Amino acid sequence: MATRELILDGVPVLMYHGVAASAPATVDARELKYWVTTTAFRRHLVQIRLVGLKTGRLDDLRNAGVVLTFDDGRASDYETALPVLSQAGALAEFFVNTATVGQPGHLTWSQIAEMQRAGMSFQSHGHDHVVLLGLAPKLLDHQLRTSKHLLEDRLGRSVDFVAAPYGLLDRRVVAAALEAGYRAVCTSWSWPAQPGERTVNRVAIYAHTSEAQFAAILRQRPAGYLPELARTALGFVPKRVMLKVRPGRLGVQCDVRTA
């Protein structure tokens, strides 16, 4: 008798960082694994169509087949990802740090406005790209509210989701985000997202993500999620210890300036 394949409950929410023919020379070597080639990204969109899924929105997660998200507000979002998405008729959510808008290698406000007119959505990645864990309450609130308000003022629409930089968050960060007016906080926890939850799981897509693994992610098979989930779980405690003693080794920014 044939065995029934295990399918995970929820909605696949994919997390990208950069799409380009090759990563810019200014990208830190530790970030290269997050840069997906344009060819690979096109194939991903083809796979999504062949599986029979449609890209949707975080604010309508229950009816989405898959959600595409991009972190960091890189210039490649406009230069490379947008044309590919538009050609495929696909939607995506872009999480930007408002302090870096207009900086070299990042999106400008005019590009963000153009992308929104093209059907893309923008959410918060904090004001600065800093670790939110351990920030004093006032600084944490500043990071969350400043980004939300700037985006809302510029785009004329509500910003309901925030993604913690580096995927580092705890209950205090989630509570502060909800208090600041967000509906939910997006994580880097490799598992399908559950509609209606206060946290939204996302699975990272890497340069080394194979077509087979990508297909498993779309079909919500454990093989698409468990390897990254295990890596995250095993590194949870060591990563937090390193944050306290030698954060530079992780390539993260922990200091923040107030407005």
Regions found by a protein language model. Give the residues of each.
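C-terminal active-site subregion of NodB/CE4 polysaccharide deacetylases
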Residues: 1-69, 74-76, 134-161, 167-259
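Histidine-centered catalytic micro-motifs
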Residues: 14, 121-129
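Acidic (Asp/Glu)-rich catalytic clusters
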Residues: 49-52, 82-90, 107-124, 178
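A short alpha/beta connector and helix-capping loop motif
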Residues: 76-98
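Short beta-strand and adjacent tight-turn residues that come in two discontinuous sequence segments
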Residues: 95, 125, 185-187
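Short histidine/acidic/glycine/proline-rich micro-motifs that form metal-
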Residues: 98-102, 131, 165-168
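Charged helix-capping and loop-helix junction motifs
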Residues: 105-112, 138-144
